[in-house]
């Protein structure tokens, strides 16, 4: 009897040991995650309450930096300009993105696939490239501005150097995100409701406004909030377009106060502004969660053996095609084309023949000047290494948070999503401070590895948003079956769960590579000889008036993104959309 009872006891003990075998790893992953996010937050938080830079031994406690948020006229003026900027960006992006998604995904518009491919270009381009292209094409001396003025006689047909002007450009840069969110929601709908409406005699417009758009409401809310967040965080477009004429938004004020040429940089005010920005973003994400709590009311789940029927545009087919073509050509192709053209000429002007101005000197400089070449190599290295390390770290975090019984898994889940509310400037500022005080990290100062840490913090939530849902879709029966034969948590994750999550992990890798190549704001505070990246180098060159090398670097950034994404998508079979 005693022997019979001891066998189950021993088996149960073995299973408990197997189940708990991953506790040390889970704890380590949790601690590393908290430390990384803490690096971005704590130093900047402390600086907000000091009257001098954090590294000054005589710095004293003060709340003046917080008071300045509501008392300083320069600061309060930026809130008004930022509100106007964000409003226009959201209006442009939502209007263009939603319309494009419906026309491409749910109508019989001619050339839908070609339009979608071109519409997504800005998704893979840094906002800096879009901004440079806008200045070259639509600035006061831009090609299209001069051509339009000559044709119509208008001396100033539009004003790019204004809050509405740069907001339209930023809205165009943000449109692909709205298009993707809405396109997926428009396509993946139960066709039975539309079929019933057609049987009842409803036409295309009635189906659109009474069925398709209401079901798309969660995607529209998500896109709306994301557009506001992106508008609040954007730095490059307001800096290169609004900076020369004195227009300041919240992000550009943070940038200016950090690099003041006269006097000491106001790091305390910078930290207060950064946390104000983070608080606004945090409130927006909270409102998004509230708005989407009842999102299931707008989703129909049914048999999808047939594809939703395309809405017939009828007599509006070719006018819609023309409007879409105008947007694609003048809102995307012209901007990218202007950058390519400027990279191949010493001057870009209607008064000078393109072929007379052709030169390869800018590319020669980019490939021969040490700083330019190093920024390209650093960006390539960070994209590949950062994408791989980031994916591995995201996978580890997601497995602990979603596929374990670890006591603090909910805390880890919250920590992993916290960087969503951290703008790139806040992350860069926090890592900058940490490099001066945190033992170990100070050894990485002025190296690309410090930039890599900032990137990993910045994009933790982005990767987590891809991998976490994929892990939740894998049944827990695999975990239970593995435990029944004595497999520990680590073995179960590495031998079963991770292989089943291959597609999500590859998608995460591609996304992180693209985001790292595009990123610039996190590296602004970390720029140093030897740690240059393409984004920060372009900003520096533009402020010096070197448009040619900037355009060549922008083209190199486009080419680098295209090559890496093409290789990965073709070899690994990852889909970039759909």
Residue positions per predicted region:
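Membrane-water interface segments at the C-terminal ends of transmembrane alpha-helices
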Residues: 21-55, 69-187, 215-236, 240-242, ...
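Alpha-helical transmembrane segments of integral membrane proteins
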Residues: 11, 15, 287-324
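Short, Lys/Arg-rich, polar N-terminal cytosolic tail immediately upstream
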Residues: 1-20
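Glycine-rich helix-loop "coupling/hinge" segments at transmembrane-helix boundaries
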Residues: 58-59, 136, 236-263, 351-356, ...
């Amino acid at each position: 009897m005693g022997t019979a009872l001891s066998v189950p006891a021993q088996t149960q003990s073995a299973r408990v040991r197997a189940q708990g075998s991953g506790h040390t790893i889970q704890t380590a992953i949790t601690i590393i995650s908290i430390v990384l996010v803490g690096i971005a937050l704590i130093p900047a938080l402390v600086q907000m309450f000091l009257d001098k830079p954090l590294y000054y031994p005589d710095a004293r406690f003060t709340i003046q930096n917080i008071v300045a948020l509501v008392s300083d006229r320069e600061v309060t003026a930026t809130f008004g300009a930022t509100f106007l900027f964000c409003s226009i960006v959201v209006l442009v992006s939502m209007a263009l993105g939603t319309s494009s998604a419906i026309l491409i995904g749910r109508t019989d518009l001619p050339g839908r696939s070609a339009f979608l491919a071109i519409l997504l270009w800005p998704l893979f381009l840094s906002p800096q490239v879009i901004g440079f292209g806008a200045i070259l094409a639509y600035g006061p001396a831009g090609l299209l501005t001069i051509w339009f003025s000559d044709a119509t006689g208008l001396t100033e047909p539009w004003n790019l150097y204004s809050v509405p002007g740069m907001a339209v450009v930023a809205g165009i840069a943000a449109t692909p995100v709205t298009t993707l969110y809405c396109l997926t929601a428009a396509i993946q709908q139960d066709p039975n409701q539309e079929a019933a409406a057609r049987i009842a005699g409803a036409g295309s417009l009635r189906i659109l406004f009474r069925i398709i758009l209401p079901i798309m409401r969660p995607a529209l809310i998500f896109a709306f909030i994301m557009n506001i967040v992106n508008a609040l965080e954007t730095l490059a477009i307001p800096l290169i377009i609004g900076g020369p004429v004195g227009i300041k938004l919240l992000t550009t004020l943070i940038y200016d106060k950090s690099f003041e040429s006269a006097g000491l940089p106001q790091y305390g005010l910078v930290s207060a502004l950064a946390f104000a920005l983070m608080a606004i973003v945090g409130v927006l994400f909270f409102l998004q969660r509230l708005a989407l709590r009842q999102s299931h009311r707008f989703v129909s789940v049914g048999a999808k053996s047939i594809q939703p029927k395309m809405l017939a545009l009828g007599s509006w087919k070719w006018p819609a095609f023309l409007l879409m073509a105008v947007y694609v050509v003048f809102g995307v192709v012209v901007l990218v084309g202007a950058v390519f053209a400027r990279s191949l000429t010493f001057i870009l002007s209607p008064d000078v023949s393109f072929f007379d101005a052709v030169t390869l000197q800018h590319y020669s400089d980019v490939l021969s000047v040490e700083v330019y070449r190093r920024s390209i190599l650093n960006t390539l290295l960070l994209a590949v290494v950062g994408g791989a390390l980031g994916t591995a770290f995201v996978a580890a975090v997601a497995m602990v948070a979603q596929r374990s019984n670890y006591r603090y898994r909910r805390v880890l889940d919250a920590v992993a999503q916290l960087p969503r509310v951290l703008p790139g400037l806040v992350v860069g500022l926090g890592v900058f401070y940490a490099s001066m005080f945190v033992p170990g990290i100070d050894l990485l100062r002025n190296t690309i590895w410090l930039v890599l840490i900032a990137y990993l913090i910045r994009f933790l939530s982005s990767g987590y948003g891809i991998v976490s849902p994929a892990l939740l879709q894998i049944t827990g029966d695999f975990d239970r079956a593995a435990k029944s034969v004595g497999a520990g948590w680590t073995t179960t994750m590495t031998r079963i769960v991770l292989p089943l999550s291959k597609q999500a992990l590859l998608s995460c890798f591609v996304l992180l590579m693209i985001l790292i190549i595009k990123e610039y704001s996190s590296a602004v505070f970390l720029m140093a000889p030897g740690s240059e990246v393409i984004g920060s180098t372009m900003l520096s060159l533009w402020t010096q008036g070197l448009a040619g090398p900037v355009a060549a670097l922008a083209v190199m950034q486009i080419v680098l993104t295209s090559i890496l994404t093409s290789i990965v998508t073709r070899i690994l079979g990852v889909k970039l959309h759909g």
